[in-house]
A protein has these predicted regions:
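Non-heme di-metal
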Residues: 1-143
Length: 143
């Protein structure tokens, strides 16, 4: 909102959000023997969380909103639940690629986009190193 209202304080909000993220990481590590979970464990947890959100949480929110006469809000909760379903699928797909060791391999030509600079490559694998920003291939994602 600060940026929209042309105040030059939006950077303060962004910096504070980044600080809060780091604080959360500290607490998470303290609760998990100083470690962050593996990517595979994080994906499994994300799948579980998204599944809960789209099968229970947002439906319950929608039911309560409708009971209280807020049908427009209930409809938004239902729609957000549908978005959460796509999040679950996205995480499940990534988990499957990781398990099958195909995160950076494809049987067909695939569009690979650098998540750092936007460079686009087509092939069965991303390049070993980005031709623009020179980040390694793990910074590429399928389109």
């Amino acid at each position: 909102k600060a940026e929209e209202e042309h105040y030059s304080i939006s950077q303060t909000f962004e910096e504070t959000a980044s600080n809060e993220y780091e604080h959360a990481e500290v607490w998470f590590k303290l609760l998990n023997d100083g470690e962050l979970p593996s990517v595979m464990d994080s994906l499994k947890e994300a799948v579980s969380g998204e599944h809960y959100e789209h099968t229970y949480m947002y439906d319950e929110f929608a039911d309560i909103a409708a009971e209280e006469g807020y049908e427009d809000i209930a409809e938004k909760f239902r729609r957000v639940g549908e978005v959460e379903k796509t999040h679950e699928k996205r995480y499940m797909d990534l988990l499957e690629l990781l398990i099958d060791e195909k995160l950076y391999k494809s049987e067909n030509n695939t569009i690979w986009i650098s998540q750092k600079c936007g460079n686009i490559n087509v092939g069965k694998t991303p390049p070993d190193k980005c031709q623009i920003c020179e980040h390694e291939n793990t910074y590429f994602a399928r389109k």
